[in-house]
Amino acid sequence: SSDFSIALIDVDHFKGVNDEHGHLAGDMVLREVGLDLETQLESGSSAFRWGGDEFAVIFTNSRGESTDILNAWIQRIASQSFTADAVSISVTCSAGITSWMQDEDQQGTFRRCDQALYEAKRAGRNQVISN
């Protein structure tokens, strides 16, 4: 166990947003989702775009506290809509979160985190799975 945890977040079915509304609208949604995520983080924690429609977060608090923050944020995102070209776009997100363990390398930590993310997707999306 450690003092920080790592989360990987994926915007669910994002290809459909791009296909239906176009890439400019999709990019706007990703920017807004990322900005909203940053507003929910405590001082010292960091969020960044991981690639495509994924974000990574490094939390400076325990996995339990971080999971609570992510759960609240995921429900917040699901209840919002984003406007692009006068069209309302709603999205949901799935996340996997894990704690960094001192005897594990970075690849192992990210592998466990990625496994938790895909478990969240398999379990129905719009949720956080902690590994």
What residue ranges belong to the model's regions?
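Active-site-proximal alpha-helical element of nucleotidyl cyclase-like catalytic domains
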Residues: A25-S46, E54, T60, I77
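Hydrophobic framework residues that shape the active-site pocket
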Residues: F14, V33, W50, F55, ...
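Short catalytic/binding micro-motifs of nucleotide second-messenger systems
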Residues: T39-G44, Q75-V87, E119
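Active-site-proximal structural segments of metal-dependent nucleotidyl cyclase/transferase enzymes
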Residues: S1-H21, L37, F48
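Catalytic-core segments of nucleotide cyclases and related cyclic-nucleotide turnover enzymes
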Residues: H23, T98-S130
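Catalytic strand-loop-helix junctions within cyclic-nucleotide turnover domains
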Residues: I58-S66, D85-S88, C93-R111
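A short pre-motif secondary-structure segment
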Residues: S46-R49, I89
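Alpha-helical scaffold within the catalytic cores of cyclic-nucleotide enzymes
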Residues: G34-L35, E65-T83, R112-D114
